[in-house]
Amino acid sequence: TEADRPYTRLVFSPEFDAARNWLADAFAAAGLVCHIDSGGNLIGTRTANLEPVDGDMAGRAKVLIGSHIDTVPAGGRFDGIAGVIAALEVVHYLNEHQIELPFDLEIVDYLGEELNVWGTSCLGSRHMAGLLTPEILGRVDADGRQLASEIIRIGGTNLGCDTVRSDADQILACLELHIEQAKLLETQGHDIGIVTAIPGIYRYGISVKGQAGHSGTTPMDDRQDALVAAADIIQAINGLASDIARDENQHFVATIGKIEVFPNGAAIVPGQVEMTLDMRSASAHAKSAFLAAFETICRDSATRRHCAVDVTPLAAADIAPMDGGLMQKLSDAAAVNGLSAIKLASGAGHDTAH
């Protein structure tokens, strides 16, 4: 992590590269066969004592366990990395007790789960699922770094970005342990939350354009203040999301978490605002209801404040329901070990969704 900003391991940063090297050594020390796949995921395989299928090792059954080691700036200490280290501990336990599994076990550090400067989260798992498009791979950040080039730099080949992993039919299950990132388990006194679904996550760029002017000489009734229009939208979104969450009785949230004001001067009426909407829904109906009302909110604000409001879709990941059979196995395992468990929807996105 960055020494002066824990816990910070941005994807492709020197801290990320160092952590990847440490993890690869830890995988190898546990007897795992390590490789980096075409999408830049670090994978350590514990091979089962099975015969190849038609001479092909890739045709064997396998289970994937893992998470991610990258973070947001000043992120959580256990966010992501707990799932990778827990998966590695599973391997240590199997080795120490000489337990052979009837399938290959893959421990995965998925590349770049957190939202990054290229505007897309879950890079590795999206690539594995054939969802990392050429347009996304071709994006360039402010420093001129192309996403595809960074994946290649760390060992990926950037091939097959529009196709699902070739042995997907042989994957029996994907498991990901993760911190809750909330306080429900703590406040209710439960040990484990068994996730029922990962919500759909949708991001939109909102551009509000008015007219910059001198704050001292521009009359209040003759302003096209982009920030005031943006404030109208932000407040309305907050109220709308609260109403939908209550009425639908399902997980639904909407947040404006990033905002830029131009020219951004103390004595200047703001002429332009760029902001990002993050909307998450466990219900397709709730999503549709929100978007319909959101369109009206933007149109009304534009009319009232004499500004132009444009909305651009940035990213989308649909609702991912979890497998009922695996949920039951987790519930049974918790009971056998005397652990209190409840079922809940995940509010956060995860690699397993893809």
Describe each PLM feature range.
Residues 12-14, 73, 263-264, 285, ...:
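Short, small-residue-enriched loops and turns at beta-alpha junctions
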Residues 1-13, 111:
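N-terminal capping segment at the start of a domain
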Residues 24, 28, 33, 43-152:
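Active-site metal-coordination/substrate-binding segment of hydrolases
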Residues 312-354:
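An extended, acidic, His-containing surface patch that forms the Zn2+-binding/catalytic region
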Residues 112-113, 121-285:
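Midchain, well-structured core segments that form catalytic/ion-binding scaffolds
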Residues 290-299:
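Short amphipathic alpha-helices in soluble, non-transmembrane regions
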Residues 37, 100-101, 161-165, 217, ...:
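Flexible, glycine/charged-enriched surface loops at secondary-structure junctions
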